From Swiss-Prot:
It comes from the Bacteria. This is Inner membrane-spanning protein YciB. The gene is yciB. Belongs to the YciB family. It comes from Shewanella sp. (strain MR-4). Plays a role in cell envelope biogenesis, maintenance of cell envelope integrity and membrane homeostasis.
Length: 181
């Protein structure tokens, strides 16, 4: 259920874009992201920082897109969110307070060096995706960007999540690996 809630705004954005245009889709994205927060809080009685940051960014850049009738704002949102994720992960790692370790370290007991590798891998991933988004958003047709945002970035994120899980699994202590089998 939680994963469906995470993808709900993206699905709504894509569907509305296909039937209408980028401006109505941007408004729908704002509404869907707000709905996501309300439903998430109603079900789980808490909100993750990532959801709040995403909602703030969607609201600001979606509103700017609507007010100025310029799709450049909603296109920049993706790059800025990825840049913020990369920055947060990178700074946390430099301060020896890995966000990823704090999120997953209770379930996966691996060496700090491995958490550092995973963190820098995701910093690189988010930075590259942000840069590729700039190219696709401003050099290719709008429909290509929407498809890239919805399908390309989602698929890349899922693939990188699987790679990360396999990498972490490979470095788990033997007793913990047996528990997962």
């Amino acid at each position: 259920m939680k994963q469906l809630l995470d993808f709900l705004p993206l699905i709504i954005f894509f569907a509305v874009y296909k039937f209408f245009d980028i401006y109505i889709a941007s408004g729908a994205l704002i509404a869907a992201t707000a709905l996501q927060l309300v439903v998430t809080y109603a079900l789980y009685k808490k909100l993750e920082k990532m959801h709040l940051i995403t909602f703030a960014m969607v609201t600001v850049f979606g509103t700017l897109t609507l007010v100025f009738h310029d799709d450049a704002f909603i296109k920049w949102k993706v790059t800025i969110i990825y840049a913020l994720f990369a920055l947060a992960l990178g700074v946390s790692q430099l301060l020896n307070k890995s966000i990823l370790k704090s999120m997953l370290g209770k379930e996966m007991k691996v060496a700090d060096k491995i958490w550092a590798h995973v963190t820098w891998y995701w910093v690189s991933f988010f930075a590259i995706c942000g840069l590729v988004n700039i190219y696709v958003a401003f050099k290719l047709p709008l429909e290509t960007w929407v498809n890239f945002k919805v399908f390309g970035l989602t698929a890349l994120t899922l693939i990188n999540t699987v790679i990360t899980v396999f990498y972490l699994y490979k470095h788990l202590p033997e007793d913990q690996r047996k528990e997962l089998k």
